[in-house]
UniProtKB/Swiss-Prot annotation:
The chain crosses the membrane at residues 40-60, 84-104, 121-141, 178-198, 214-234, 249-269, 290-310. May activate the MAP kinase signaling pathway. Keywords: Membrane, Phosphoprotein, Transmembrane, Transmembrane helix. Pfam families: Solute_trans_a. Coiled coil: none annotated. GO terms for cellular component: membrane. The keyword Phosphoprotein applies. Belongs to the TMEM184 family. This is Transmembrane protein 184B. One of its GO terms (molecular function) is transmembrane transporter activity. It comes from the Eukaryota. Its main location: membrane. The gene is TMEM184B.
Length: 407
């Protein structure tokens, strides 16, 4: 039996007893109270709704990835596209698992770590895809080199007044995205370590908590990466116009940046007391973890709409058309497993990091060139200039640039 502090109605027949008796109430143990009622995140309805959106998004995106691998006619572009598309399964499934286990801080942190690490790769791969669309660094520089940077407070280029586009500008864009690929995994590992030592709790901005410092470093890093991505788009938006970059850019930036601002908004609501903690005989969850649980639920729903938008933004149909030549014959394709293996190989990311952080970068840059090959039937929409002749073989040549051309 549990004793609660609610008043018990006095017995009219026993005034003396009523006056002497304390104001208590006896409630059978296990009876529900206001604090023990499960919040929406703990209900079967929340798990079912989020699960429906997640598994639908998985089916849509996995089919799209399969079709890209099946029509793997332009590996240099589709490698980046498939990596970008994987953000939906990873974000959706990880968020769903985090939601299912959000009352357990250990599981919750691990699932969120995997999701956050892949976020960094998506920004880098989208920038690399834009490079590939335009034919490589040298082709981009031949178009924009020496042009003055338009100063605009709206577009965040007011601090670049008087500067011109140079090879240093491209280097900054790549380095700013690559640093996020390093910082984000380091912050994820730090989160796991701090969690193990009891020094990390979601939403705890105390100076003795690791959450404050991880959040500051992460926010600076992701803001720099997204700023560099925007600067590159601002400089090459006219060159990218044949490839419908607006929807692609919007989707990649919204998936990553929207989740970031959602987390910030939920953290503010938590500090304002709008998100209560869960405390019952069975489980006790802090306000920060509850806020993160709500964000996981929102992401589960959002990934369904992201899957639909990404299916349109990165269509496989243009690559399917490139499989067929003028005589209607299909060009031989790699197996799906070998195409997936090539896509998931991080060798190009490592080489690009070495190339962009090398002291010799200001003297050399690489340009993809093609040897003439048979022309296949199909539109050029979504394909890079350097790949307008499908079936050609990629070669790398080095182009010497002036060493004093800095951004």
């Amino acid at each position: 039996m549990t004793v609660r502090g609610a008043a018990l109605a006095p017995d009219p027949a026993s005034p003396t007893t009523a006056a002497a008796s304390p104001s208590i109430s006896v409630i059978p143990e296990g009876s529900p109270t206001a604090m023990e009622q499960p919040v929406f995140l703990m209900t079967t309805a929340a798990q079912a709704i989020s699960g429906f959106f997640v598994w639908t998004a998985l089916l849509i995106t996995c089919h799209q990835i399969y079709m890209h691998l099946r029509c793997y006619s332009c590996p240099n572009e589709q490698r980046y596209i498939v990596r970008i598309l994987f953000i939906v399964p990873i974000y959706a499934f990880d968020s769903w698992l985090s939601l299912l286990f959000f009352t357990n801080d250990q599981y919750y942190v691990y699932f969120g770590t995997v999701r956050d690490c892949y976020e960094a790769l998506v920004i880098y791969n989208f920038l690399s895809l834009c490079y590939e669309y335009l034919g490589g660094e040298s082709s981009i520089m031949s178009e924009i080199r020496g042009k003055p940077i338009e100063s605009s407070c709206m577009y965040g280029t007011c601090c670049l007044w008087g500067k011109t586009y140079s090879i240093g500008f491209l280097r900054f864009c790549k380095q700013a995205t690559l640093q996020f690929c390093v910082v984000k995994p380091l912050m994820a590992v730090s989160t796991v370590v701090l969690q193990a030592f009891g020094k990390y709790r979601d939403g705890d901005f105390d100076v003795t908590s690791g959450y404050l410092y991880v959040t500051i470093i992460y926010n600076i890093s992701v803001s720099l990466a997204l700023y560099a991505l925007f600067l590159f788009y601002f400089a090459t938006r006219e060159l990218l116009s044949p490839y419908s970059p607006v929807l692609k850019f919007f989707m990649v930036k919204s998936v990553i940046f929207l989740s970031f601002w959602q987390g910030m908004l939920l953290a503010i609501l938590e500090k304002c007391g709008a998100i209560p903690k869960i405390h019952s005989a069975r489980v006790s969850v802090g306000e920060g973890t509850v806020a993160a649980g709500y964000q996981d639920f929102i992401i589960c729903v959002e990934m369904f709409f992201a899957a639909l938008a990404l299916r349109h933004a990165f269509t496989y149909k243009v690559y399917a058309d490139k499989r067929v030549d003028a005589q209607g014959r299909c060009a031989p394709m790699k197996s799906i497993s070998s195409s997936l293996k090539e896509t998931m190989n991080p060798h190009d990311i490592v080489q690009d990091a070495i190339h962009n952080f090398s002291p010799a970068y200001q003297q050399y840059t690489q340009q993809s060139t093609l040897e003439p090959g048979p022309t296949w039937r199909g539109g050029a929409h979504g394909l890079s200039r350097s790949h307008s002749l499908s079936g050609a073989r990629d070669n790398e040549k080095t182009l010497l640039l002036s060493s004093d051309d800095e951004f």
